[in-house]
Amino acid sequence: IPLRLVGSEMCISDSSNPHPHGQIWAQKSIPQEVKKKQFNLKKYYAENNESLLSAYLKKELKVKERIICQNESFVALVPFWATWPFEAMIISKTHYKSILELSENEIIDFASILKTLTIKYDNLFQTPFPYSSGIHQAPTNNNLNSEWHMHMSFYPPLLRSSSVKKFMVGYEMFGEPQRDITPEHAAEKLRNCSEIHFSSVM
């Protein structure tokens, strides 16, 4: 059974529910997007004996320009394939298939980087920053699923200010998504945001 943990912050993201809320989805079948991801993860792992996200994270840590912040256990970055202007991922530095494998210290580090990233989001436009987020991890089907590397993705809709939202329309609906700013520029803007929430210094 694939389990997905998803959450939304503020109603502008994707719902009419005006408060932050979370959901846990469990299904008998794997959704198409996740199935495609699993196929590619499995193929890479079989060929390289390493998780795709482990290899990807090594490259990002060398380049550094898309890194937002990091701590001992996790890295927050803007992936080079990001669709949303300030899309981000939190990836564990150690290859864990599931959030259930984290140690007590790693859980604290996960909470810490989650707090840092969401404060930076709020500070970007000095507003409670809307986003949808979700954790992808190995299915609970009793298989090894060694190819999976748990990660959390954030899809925020804001573009240039607290009132300008990105819409997927026209060519983006019928062709492919277009980026309004580069992942490198988005990461730089978020990296330069304070880790102290704007509301506490006003």
Q: Predicted regions span which residues?
A:
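Catalytic strand-loop segment that frames the active site of acyl-thioester-processing enzymes
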Residues: 76-98
